[in-house]
């Protein structure tokens, strides 16, 4: 135990200092398109048909398409606020963020999810430290929210036999 304790300071000195920007970017990227601790959003929705994206279990749970649209909505809302823009009108009914899914627009939804997640990475990369300090909690929650719903998407895919385990985290 003493040997481990003595080696920690040396190990810590070899590490590049972590910055807030670095942590936030890592979280955004690993919930978008870089596999790390969990499957990212792009992998989760990759290769699904509109019919698969529309499937619901009949118990009130959301479809993959609905989950995707919910992610798009909340990422766009927060992104607009971060950029100082007016976010889309919102009635306050969170159910509406799920129920707007249109199966005919599935491929466009997949592209829009990728686009908004890419834009988040760009604006965080360009932001100064003061802006990131003010927004750190919100951005961290966005990453956690994205990971939560991506987990639901993976669960549905596994449940329905639409998941390739080779795409998972090893």
Regions found by a protein language model. Give the residues of each.
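Amphipathic, well-packed alpha-helical segments that form the structural scaffold of globular domains
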Residues: 42, 46-50, 118-125
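Acidic/histidine-rich alpha-helical segments that form the ligand environment
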Residues: 97-132, 137-140
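N-terminal pre-domain segments of enzymes
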Residues: 15-25
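Short coil/turn linker and secondary-structure boundary residues
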Residues: 19, 48, 62, 101-104, ...
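Short, contiguous alpha-helical
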Residues: 25-38, 42-45, 52-95, 130-170
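Bacterial Sec-dependent N-terminal signal peptides
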Residues: 1-16
């Amino acid at each position: 135990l003493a040997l481990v304790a003595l080696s920690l300071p040396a190990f810590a000195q070899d590490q590049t200092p972590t910055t807030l920007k670095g942590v936030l970017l890592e979280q955004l990227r690993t919930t978008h398109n870089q596999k790390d601790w969990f499957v990212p959003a792009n992998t989760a929705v990759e290769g699904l048909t509109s019919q698969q994206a529309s499937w619901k279990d009949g118990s009130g749970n959301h479809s993959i398409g609905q989950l995707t649209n919910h992610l798009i909505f909340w990422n766009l809302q927060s992104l607009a606020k971060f950029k100082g823009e007016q976010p889309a009108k919102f009635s306050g009914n969170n159910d509406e963020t799920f129920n707007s899914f249109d199966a005919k627009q599935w491929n466009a939804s997949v592209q829009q999810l990728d686009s908004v997640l890419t834009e988040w990475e760009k604006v965080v990369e360009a932001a100064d430290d003061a802006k990131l300090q003010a927004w750190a909690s919100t951005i961290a929650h966005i990453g956690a929210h994205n990971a939560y719903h991506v987990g639901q998407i993976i669960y549905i895919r596994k449940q329905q036999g639409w998941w390739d385990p080779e795409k998972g985290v090893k």
